[in-house]
Amino acid sequence: ARVPDDDMNSLEDSDSMESCFAGEEEFYSSTLTPPTPSEDIWKKFELYPTPPLSPSHNPDDKESDRHPRHHQQDGDGSPSRSYQHLMDDDDLPLVNPQVPLLDLSSAPPIAALIQDCMWSSIIAEERRKLFMKSEKKHAEERATKKASTPSSGVMLPPLVPASEYGTSDCVDPSAVCPYPLSETRLDLFSSGTNTPSDSEEEIDVVTVEKKHHSVHKINTTRPYHKQSTKVRHQLHHRPISVALVGSLRGRPSTATILSIPIKKLKTEGNLEEVKQILQKSNLIRSSSGSSRGSSRGCSRNSSSRRVNQVSHPSSDSEDTEKRACHNVLERQRREDLRTSFLLLRDEVPELGTCDRAAKVVILKKATDYVSSLRDREETLRMDMATEKNRNLQLRRRLEALLAPLTL
């Protein structure tokens, strides 16, 4: 006896909506013990059953009876009525009732066919990997062609021919999709098979080569920028010790100054000697540059050129060298000023016992002491003048007394 269509539709609707409702045991157990977040998430996924279930059949049926609904037809003889038992109208938005559907019973048996209305994720993954390999191969060929003959336009990747996939890995679309493929659209990459790791594997070779070219240009324009900044950073944290190639055959250079520790320069260095060494180094640099421009074939000039290139790679290194020399001279000047203030403090009698006198106090006391010394000098001059006059008067009196005795 044939089951009516309305009863069959109601039974299938109840079967499809059965997973949307939880049983009494699940409901009461969930109220007593709240589910973990993972269980709650999976239950939410179960509320949306996609795709519709395949028609049930007994395992003892023959191969020809696996699709009984495809052979059942209504009074009008259209096979589209049999698919309306399995899916609603909303599930088949692209089915055209004017186009005749395919009959799966007449299709040849294929080993890789899927006995369901969904694509197999494994076969889709294999097809996607083959497509990615061919895409990379075409991208490499396109990159080599573009490197040989550069062009300004951007070309889209060509479509991969179907012959490169192989017939053993493909599935007959007519065995899976019973309606025409001209009105359907199947996107393998939006069906959940694309993962972040798979998307990261796709690399555009042309853009990578452009990036390498741009990085190479930047590195060639300023090759010693990082080294110069590193030298600046090291000058603030440790004594100045720049390792250069060496002096030019016994002649002094700035490397001899920079290699000396700061404490040694403070104690033993002289300001005039440092200035003379700097002037000699500048003369050596200018003479080596002129000789390098005049005669390039000479071995001595080539060696001096190498030394200059190694010791002065860029303008930044020259600035740091000049700044280091200036700092050495400035420290020497401050040290001399400090020693002069200490000597002045020792000369003032009021500040002889004060070890921590300020510079302003030292200057004030020194000016007062100098003014007092000048007043005392003036009084002493006056006393000296009076003493000279008295001495002169005494001599005249002595001469007057001795004059009658001589006669």
Swiss-Prot record:
Subunit relationships: Efficient DNA binding requires dimerization with another bHLH protein.
This protein's GO CC annotations: nucleus
UniProt subcellular location: Nucleus
Region Disordered, residue ranges: 1-92, 134-155, 284-323
UniProt source species: Asterias rubens (Common European starfish)
Main location: nucleus
Transmembrane stretches, start-end: none
Signal peptide (residue range): none
Biased composition (Basic and acidic residues): 58-74, 134-144
Protein name: Myc protein
Compositionally biased intervals (Acidic residues): 1-16
Domain of life: Eukaryota
PANTHER family the UniProt entry points to: MYC PROTO-ONCOGENE
GO MF terms held by the record: DNA binding; DNA-binding transcription factor activity, RNA polymerase II-specific; protein dimerization activity
Record-linked Gene3D superfamilies: Helix-loop-helix DNA-binding domain
Keyword Transcription applies: yes
